[in-house]
UniProtKB/Swiss-Prot annotation:
Complex I is composed of at least 49 different subunits. This is a component of the iron-sulfur (IP) fragment of the enzyme. One of its GO terms (molecular function) is NADH dehydrogenase (ubiquinone) activity. PANTHER family: NADH DEHYDROGENASE [UBIQUINONE] IRON-SULFUR PROTEIN 8, MITOCHONDRIAL, NADH DEHYDROGENASE UBIQUINONE IRON-SULFUR PROTEIN 8, MITOCHONDRIAL. One of its GO terms (cellular component) is membrane. This is NADH dehydrogenase [ubiquinone] iron-sulfur protein 8-A, mitochondrial. It is found in: Mitochondrion. Gene3D superfamilies: 3.30.70.3270. Belongs to the complex I 23 kDa subunit family. It comes from Arabidopsis thaliana.
Length: 222
């Protein structure tokens, strides 16, 4: 490859040299016809010859650089040197799932329904979360109890519709529905992502400690 580039560049230089030589000869012939232009023509020829030598030197330098780049693969070496540099840099990734990074207290993960410390359900069936949900993923049915309070008989969330905007958690006046810290809830079937009230309460019981701590740490900003 380098020899081909060198040969092409040499042929180009020869052709340019012949053209400039022809122009120089034509200029010298005209100078002979002019009695007073001999010295001017010779000076011009000297300048053209000097310019030609500079261009030839420059072109040979270009040919030499191209040959070196082709023979020694300098671009590849430059890329490999960059790879080698980052190879010894400190790692910025973790070995998931054996290692896990920290989560923000505002992280919005799997949904959960919370209880009071007495075990009573927090949800009062106001349906604000159902009304505010932009994806219409929440379905609530409720009935009135003997003591006059309202509690849900059905609380479903279609997790395949949920966009994890957190509006349900923001709208809830009693912190009943929350998005917990769990993000590992992938399933193999669609039906497993249709959460009912029992599933949501189970999530709340499992993650209550983390959820309560996150809510306390963010209480000044809510």
């Amino acid at each position: 490859m380098a020899s081909i580039l060198a040969r092409r560049s040499l042929n180009t230089l020869r052709a340019r040299h012949l053209v400039l030589s022809g122009q120089a000869l034509q200029g010298s012939h005209l100078s002979r016809l002019q009695s007073r232009g001999i010295s001017y023509g010779s000076n011009k020829d000297d300048e053209e010859a000097e310019q030609l030598s500079k261009e030839i030197s420059k072109d040979w330098n270009t040919v030499f650089e191209r040959s070196i780049n082709t023979l020694f693969l300098t671009e590849m070496v430059r890329g490999l040197s960059l790879t080698l540099k980052y190879f010894f840099d400190p790692k910025v990734t973790i070995n998931y799932p054996f290692e896990k990074g920290p989560l923000s207290p505002r992280f919005r993960g799997e949904h959960a329904l919370r209880r009071y410390p007495t075990g009573e359900e927090r949800c009062i069936a106001c349906k604000l979360c159902e009304a505010v949900c932009p994806a219409q993923a929440i379905t609530i049915e409720a009935e009135e109890r003997e003591d006059g309070s309202r509690r849900t008989t059905r609380y479903d969330i279609d997790m395949t519709k949920c966009i994890y905007c957190g509006f349900c958690q923001e709208a809830c006046p009693v912190d009943a529905i929350v998005e917990g810290p769990n993000f590992e809830f992938a399933t193999e079937t669609h039906e497993e992502l249709l959460y009912d009230k029992e599933k949501l309460l189970e999530n709340g019981d499992r993650w209550e400690t983390e959820i309560a701590e996150n809510l306390r740490s963010e209480s000044l900003y809510r």
